[in-house]
């Protein structure tokens, strides 16, 4: 039996009902971003590998599919994340002074799925602010992320916050940590305290105690006060906790948790990191944070903060109903009918003309009206 219809693992077609909802949410979110002053950019699907991975962490390299350009012989990559591309556009192509707000929407491709059931072809949409180092930019980005989730009909949202500066300060005096860095991050992210105890044997006691405490520093905003009492009283850690406290009180329309061991994207971020969750689901639905160092690789270090989400994931969770109202028209050679259909379509109506010999209903549309011939010509009436 032929299996030419099979697709690669974790790759799937988007069928009409899902595509309809994804497109509706994409339009809603891009329209929302525009009301905040964000400009749409469309980076290419593939770039030379050195450009695509510049300023990013090792994780992105592993997720990037590589191929050889038959024109130049150079290695290219299919993008696994649009955010570094937008940073390149801001730093190298636009090169504007002051604040720049950019947004994007497009497919990305992962060499490996992020999870057991995760797609390898997410549809990523997001927004970025460049040029402002203050917390005002982070507050705006978090507001925009929550507004985007609200536009998708998601409620009971929780934001988990962390700060890359805390771990950076703890590891600053431990150059030998690079040998166990990946294992250390994995243990912190999974809150595997026994593994942490084993990995931190031989470290200075102050840093070891702090690293072992990070997985326990999870919960409400009061965690910030617990962290001040538990972690070393360094200026860098104090600033990071101050920023988390200042951001937490500004969140509207969501509850706030602090999770000081949620370090996904640590190599990429330079400050506050945050993720949005909805009730009953273990995985985040949107994620973002500050990444001031990315543009430096393109010759222009700029403060930057942003967020992104996967439209396919959000559409699967969204209660939004998208079934367009349409007008049913018979097939007839009457020029007046063709003129009536053209006029309705020009006015933005969906008109579906029945082809000869077919009487089935289309589940894609709700044909609640129909065109019928009357004495005065063709008219729209309830169906």
Curated annotation (Swiss-Prot):
This function is generally fulfilled by the C-terminal part of HisG, which is missing in some bacteria such as this one. Gene3D superfamilies: Bira Bifunctional Protein, Domain 2. One of its GO terms (cellular component) is cytoplasm. InterPro entries: aa-tRNA-synth_II/BPL/LPL, HisRS-like_core, HisRS/HisZ, HisZ. CDD domains: HisRS-like_core (cd00773). GO terms for biological process: histidyl-tRNA aminoacylation; L-histidine biosynthetic process. It comes from Cupriavidus necator (strain ATCC 17699 / DSM 428 / KCTC 22496 / NCIMB 10442 / H16 / Stanier 337) (Ralstonia eutropha). GO terms for molecular function: histidine-tRNA ligase activity. Transmembrane segments: none annotated. The gene is hisZ. It is found in: Cytoplasm. Belongs to the class-II aminoacyl-tRNA synthetase family. HisZ subfamily. This is ATP phosphoribosyltransferase regulatory subunit. Disulfide bonds: none annotated. It comes from the Bacteria. Required for the first step of histidine biosynthesis. May allow the feedback regulation of ATP phosphoribosyltransferase activity by histidine.
């Amino acid at each position: 039996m032929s299996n030419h219809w099979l697709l690669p693992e974790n790759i799937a077609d988007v069928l009409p009902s899902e595509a309809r909802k994804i497109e509706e949410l994409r339009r809603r979110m891009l329209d929302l971003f525009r009301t905040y002053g964000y400009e749409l950019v469309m980076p290419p699907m593939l770039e030379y590998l050195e450009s695509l991975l510049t300023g990013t962490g090792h994780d992105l390299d592993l997720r990037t599919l590589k191929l050889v350009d038959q024109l130049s012989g150079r290695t290219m990559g299919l993008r696994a994340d649009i955010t570094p591309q937008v940073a390149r556009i801001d730093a190298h192509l636009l090169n504007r002074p002051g604040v720049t707000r950019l947004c994007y929407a497009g497919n990305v491709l992962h060499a490996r799925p992020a999870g057991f059931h995760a797609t390898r072809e997410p549809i990523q949409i997001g927004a970025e602010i460049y040029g402002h180092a203050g917390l005002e930019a982070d507050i705006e980005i978090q507001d925009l992320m929550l507004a985007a989730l609200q536009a998708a009909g998601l409620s009971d949202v929780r934001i988990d916050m962390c700060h890359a500066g805390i771990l950076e300060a703890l590891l600053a005096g431990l150059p030998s940590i690079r040998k166990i860095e990946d294992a250390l991050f994995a243990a912190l992210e999974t809150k595997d305290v026994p593994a942490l105890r084993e990995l931190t044997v031989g470290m200075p006691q102050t840093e070891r105690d702090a690293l072992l405490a990070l997985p326990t520093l999870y919960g409400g905003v009061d965690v910030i006060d617990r962290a001040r009492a538990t972690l070393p009283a360094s200026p860098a850690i104090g600033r990071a906790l101050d920023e988390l406290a200042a951001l937490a009180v500004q969140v509207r329309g969501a509850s706030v948790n602090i999770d000081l061991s949620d370090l996904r994207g640590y190599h990429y971020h330079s400050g506050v990191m945050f993720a949005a969750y909805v009730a009953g689901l273990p995985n985040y639905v949107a994620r973002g944070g500050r990444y001031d160092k990315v543009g430096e690789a393109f010759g222009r270090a700029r403060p930057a903060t942003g967020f992104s989400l996967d439209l396919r994931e959000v559409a699967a969770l969204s209660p939004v109903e998208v079934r367009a109202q349409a007008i049913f028209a018979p097939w007839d050679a009457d020029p007046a009918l063709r003129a009536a259909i053209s006029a309705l379509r020009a006015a933005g109506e969906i008109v579906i003309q029945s082809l000869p010999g077919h009487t089935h209903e289309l589940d894609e549309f709700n044909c609640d009206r129909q065109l019928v011939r009357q004495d005065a010509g063709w008219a729209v009436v309830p169906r």
